[in-house]
């Protein structure tokens, strides 16, 4: 089997150094290696912005680890960049001289504007969204704010505040109090006010976060049984939980990983300031950021389609799915969704896209075997990289595939976090009916149909005489009616 070439991106961040190694497979990126080491470079800056010898040593030690992985990758396929702390350091040349020797590769110190632009590039490739999108990336020593649409960044700024610098400035002695948080929030608002009006004037439809702070928040939300969308009340609730712990060395929040503890309060304070200053309603986690932007820059790919569409197309190709049949199921499921949306108040923004992808990928489990194909499909989705899909969207997709036939497994639908459990169940009911109507797998064999609903009651109307002429699908529909009625959902099939 011919392997495509490897590509590597290294981000010398203010808090951590990251290395991402990928290869392109079936039109999508497959992660080969991902390494992160906490270097705390920003903590080594003195008042004159000189990097301490100890901080530089931590950086060089990390790069020695990375250098081994780079030996077998063509130099043209590697990009290494330094960000905020290295932009600030007055003795950066001393650090770079040894760092480039260790890596055997040149290192670029990119401007704040280029960093923001590259972050947006990574987000646009790995996260779905229509209309203007606000991207927030809270780094160790800088915070990038970008508004863009599709692949075009329209407004961008790199601000001099980050989770490491705010930790040192406002939580340096480890005290977690209301006063300390308010002090940190107020300081962040002072920085934000210089640019806030431009962002409010341009506006956005969706907001995504591309930093470790937002990753930590989403992990906490899901661990605590909340939806994945970050809101100001949720942030304020977490601030209250942190204050109740009293000190940084006693900080314990359900779902917060140990390696994120130290900089979590400072990142949280900055994010609260951003939410309050820009009047943000909600935010989700981006699929990628700076490193992914560097990789896509190396590849030179275009931005002609939605990130989730690219992922679905790649999976269809990789697992050799019947694309024509998958698209027929998708069209049938979407038609059913559109008919039921007003009565069931289904989410066009959050529910319909995932139903589409469930229809397109419903046969992915067949690559293992038929009998337990729904379980296999769910397992694959749970354990594969899917650029463009948030963790909760992946869980919903997995739950729909798990429930595509046989008995319902309601717990998977109720615990996914992307939409309400009730909506997820209704999406599963739609998918199952669409799959039965498309069983012939041939163009022109899907009947015209009407679906009507009142609360959980569902009626499918087919052309007169259709059931007598299509024995197998009629039998499957009757079995499906029995399954749904057994749970307490009145369901019937009629002809007219």
Residue ranges and their predicted role:
Residues 414-415, 445, 491-496:
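C-terminal amphipathic alpha-helical interaction region
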Residues 77-80:
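Conserved beta-strand/loop subsegment of P-loop NTPase cores
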Residues 2-30:
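N-terminal basic/disordered segments at the start of proteins
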Residues 141-142:
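Active-site-adjacent helix-turn-beta-strand microarchitecture at beta-sheet edges
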Residues 4-7, 21-24, 40, 44-73, ...:
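Helical "lid/coupling" subdomains associated with nucleotide-phosphate turnover
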Residues 469-491:
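Short, non-transmembrane amphipathic alpha-helical segments
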Residues 27-32, 152-154:
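Beta-strand initiation motifs
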């Amino acid at each position: 089997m011919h392997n495509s070439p490897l590509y590597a991106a290294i981000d010398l961040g203010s808090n951590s150094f990251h290395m991402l190694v990928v290869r392109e497979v079936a039109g999508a990126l497959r992660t080969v290696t991902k390494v992160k080491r906490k270097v705390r470079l920003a903590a080594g800056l003195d008042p004159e912005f000189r990097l301490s010898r100890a901080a530089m040593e931590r950086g060089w030690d990390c790069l020695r680890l990375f250098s081994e992985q780079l030996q077998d990758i063509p130099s043209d396929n590697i990009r290494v960049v330094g960000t905020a702390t290295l932009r600030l350091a007055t003795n950066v040349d001393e650090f770079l001289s040894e760092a480039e020797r260790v890596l055997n590769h040149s290192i670029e110190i990119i401007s704040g504007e280029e960093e923001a632009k590259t972050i947006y590039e990574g987000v646009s490739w790995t996260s779905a969204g229509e209309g203007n999108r606000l991207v927030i990336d809270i780094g160790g020593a800088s915070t990038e704010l970008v508004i863009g649409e599709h692949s075009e960044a329209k407004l961008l700024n790199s601000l001099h505040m980050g989770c490491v610098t705010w930790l040192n400035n406002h939580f340096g002695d480890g005290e977690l109090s209301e006063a300390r948080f308010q002090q940190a929030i107020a300081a962040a608002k002072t920085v934000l006010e210089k640019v806030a009006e431009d962002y409010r004037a341009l506006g956005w439809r969706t907001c995504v976060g591309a930093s470790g702070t937002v990753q930590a928040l989403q992990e906490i939300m899901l661990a605590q049984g909340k939806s994945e969308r970050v809101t100001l009340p949720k942030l304020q609730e977490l601030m209250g939980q942190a204050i109740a712990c009293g000190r940084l060395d006693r900080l314990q929040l359900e779902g917060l990983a140990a390696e994120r503890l130290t900089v979590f309060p400072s990142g949280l304070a900055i994010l609260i300031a951003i939410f309050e200053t820009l009047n943000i309603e909600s935010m989700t986690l981006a699929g990628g950021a700076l490193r992914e932007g560097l990789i896509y820059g190396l590849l030179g790919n275009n931005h002609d389609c939605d990130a989730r569409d690219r992922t679905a197309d790649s999976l269809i190709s990789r697992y050799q799915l019947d694309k024509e049949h998958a698209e027929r199921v998708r069209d049938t499921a979407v038609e059913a969704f559109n008919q039921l949306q007003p009565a069931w108040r289904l989410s066009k923004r959050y529910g319909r896209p995932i139903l589409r992808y469930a229809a397109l990928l419903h046969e992915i489990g067949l690559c293992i075997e038929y009998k337990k194909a729904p379980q296999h499909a769910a397992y694959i989705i749970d354990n594969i990289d899917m650029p463009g899909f948030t963790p909760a969207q992946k869980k919903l997709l997995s739950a729909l595939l798990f429930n595509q036939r046989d008995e319902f497994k309601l717990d998977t639908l109720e615990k996914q976090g992307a939409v309400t459990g009730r909506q997820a169940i209704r999406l599963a009911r739609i998918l199952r009916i669409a799959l039965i109507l498309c069983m012939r797998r041939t163009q022109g064999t899907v009947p015209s149909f009407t679906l009507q609903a009142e609360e959980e009651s569902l009626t499918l109307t087919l052309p007169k005489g259709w059931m007598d002429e299509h024995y197998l699908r009629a039998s499957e529909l009757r079995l499906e009616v029995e399954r749904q009625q057994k749970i307490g959902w009145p369901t019937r099939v009629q002809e007219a």
